[in-house]
């Protein structure tokens, strides 16, 4: 697993443009900022965009994420070969190693996106809440996984491309 770099931007933006039906709201400025802030993973055709919350944030009808919880914003894959599950689970392990992350990971998905919901459930996430967007016109579900904190492992050895100096 590796972080996306600015040289990956055009390739990643094309992936999102080719999947406008699933990701109509992705703006290129947001994508570039995510890459620049090391909040975008890009490995084996899999893109994961995430954020570690800096304050309490409402993410469902009832659910609020706390400071240091992770919100997984987008997952996009170009293949159906298991690579998305592999990278997602590596991402979960990465979050478990971050000293400033709680280990609680949330994501929101459209209620109608059955294939994505099955994918999240296969990878250990649980449906915990509902949400809606666009004045209630779009229904969504909130999923959560809590990963066990694994402070005894070294980030640099687990992710060779990880630069710990960026997080000090």
Question: Predicted segments — roles?
Answer:
Residues 121-130:
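Conserved acetyl-CoA-binding loop of GNAT-fold acetyltransferases
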Residues 95-109:
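Conserved GNAT acetyl-CoA-binding A-motif
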Residues 36-54:
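Conserved beta-hairpin
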Residues 1-7, 149-168:
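Conserved N-terminal entry element of GNAT/NAT acetyltransferase domains
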Residues 77-96, 118-122:
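Conserved acetyl-CoA-binding loop-helix of GNAT-fold acetyltransferases
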Residues 48-71, 134-138:
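Conserved acyl-donor/pantetheine-binding loop and adjacent beta-alpha core of acyl/acetyltransferases
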Residues 1-26:
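Short amphipathic alpha-helix that is part of the acyltransferase structural core
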Residues 77, 106-117, 133-139:
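Conserved beta-strand-loop-alpha-helix junction that forms the acyl-donor binding cleft
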